[in-house]
């Protein structure tokens, strides 16, 4: 029985601060303002052939399912289902239906689905701090083109995991996404403010079903570590944003469509870590190099290019874009003058200055 006195099947009193395993079919009736919370010390397991927890929501004035503990949905050997759905449409209360600051683990035989008629607004509607997926997670709103976001702080998606969302995914500040398989599908990954957002790509073309990655607001940062060849469909800069890129030796990261949010964007940069020539490229776009900056004429925007070697020292050289017909992209290269070239240039300058001084008439 809940603390408010409302019976919710056989679930223990909310907040749950012990370990409890669902082996049958249990329900949270949020449409009747019956909410459920997993506390700091709570562990909620959904294990078994017919094990299912259904969370019915009927408003978003406050979260229907929340907590800071752990939820395990299925495992490597046990089935388990977590179903979040609505009883019908309702007026937008501008809060999260799920607001989970703990961890939700979806095992290999687990299934976590979100569906129903939830409000459409430019903001989060579901929020999970830590989401680990070995099984299946799906988000399918009843209304097409729903503008709300599914906020995921830290994501671990295994090689066999499937994460399909018909609404945008928002990475919270300083989040880490470890992607090992290509089962990730969503219209967009939105990058919110934070100084250490990271996406680790541990295989080839793992984000081919993500239409674009966008900086959502000013001052964003994202580092992409590509450990294999990857092509990103799109990437959008906003003002005061930095994209950090690290590509393993012999691999290539390509952004097919590099975009700028609008014509007022400024102070943006791409930083390359442990840089090697040929490791990064962009699709067939109307761009060119000016000094140590990439110029995008469609929005009259300059993107600073900064490269570091393996020791973290800045590489000073001449940038160029070279067309690669195999990948249909412009590959970035930086030519660093050899020490001998520097010596010749410096020697020439010294000789020029000496001759100039000799020819300068003496003052009277």
Predicted features and spans:
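Surface-exposed loop/turn positions within long extracellular repeat scaffolds
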Residues: 5, 10-17, 27-67, 77-79, ...
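Short, charged juxtamembrane terminal tails flanking transmembrane helices
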Residues: 359-364
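A short, hydrophobic C-terminal helix/tail in secreted or cell-surface proteins
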Residues: 338-356
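Extracellular/surface-exposed low-complexity segments
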Residues: 1-30, 102-106, 203, 242-337, ...
């Amino acid at each position: 029985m809940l603390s408010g006195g409302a019976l919710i099947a056989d679930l223990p009193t909310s907040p749950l601060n012990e370990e409890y395993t669902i082996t049958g079919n249990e329900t949270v009736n949020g449409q009747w303002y019956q909410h459920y919370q997993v506390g700091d010390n709570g562990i909620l397991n959904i294990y078994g052939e017919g094990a299912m927890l259904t969370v019915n929501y009927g408003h978003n004035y406050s979260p229907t399912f929340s907590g800071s503990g752990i939820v395990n949905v299925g495992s490597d050997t046990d089935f388990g289902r977590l179903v979040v759905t609505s009883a019908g449409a309702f007026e937008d209360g501008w809060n999260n239906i799920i607001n989970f600051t703990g961890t939700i683990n979806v095992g290999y035989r687990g299934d976590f689905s979100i569906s129903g008629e939830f409000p459409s607004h430019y903001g989060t509607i579901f929020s999970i701090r830590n989401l680990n997926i070995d099984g299946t997670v799906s988000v399918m709103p009843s209304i097409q083109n729903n503008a709300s976001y599914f906020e995921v702080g830290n994501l671990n998606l295994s090689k066999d995991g499937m994460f399909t969302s018909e609404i945008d995914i928002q990475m919270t500040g300083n989040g880490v996404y470890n992607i090992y398989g290509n089962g990730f599908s969503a219209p967009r990954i939105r990058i919110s403010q934070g100084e250490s957002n990271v996406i680790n790509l541990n295989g080839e073309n793992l984000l081919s079903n993500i239409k674009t990655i966008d900086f959502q607001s000013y001052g964003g940062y994202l580092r992409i570590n590509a450990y294999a060849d990857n092509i990103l469909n799109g990437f959008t800069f906003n003002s005061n944003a930095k994209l950090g890129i690290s590509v393993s030796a012999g691999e290539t990261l390509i952004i097919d469509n590099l975009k700028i949010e609008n014509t007022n964007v400024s102070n943006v940069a791409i930083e390359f870590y442990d840089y090697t020539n040929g490791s990064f490229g962009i699709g067939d776009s109307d761009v060119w190099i000016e000094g140590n900056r990439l110029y995008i004429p469609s929005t009259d925007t300059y993107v600073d290019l900064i490269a570091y070697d393996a020791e973290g020292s800045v590489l000073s050289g001449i940038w160029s874009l070279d067309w690669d017909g195999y990948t249909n992209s412009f590959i970035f290269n930086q030519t660093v003058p050899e020490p001998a070239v520097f010596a010749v240039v410096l020697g020439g300058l010294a000789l020029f200055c000496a001759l100039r001084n000799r020819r300068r008439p003496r003052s009277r």
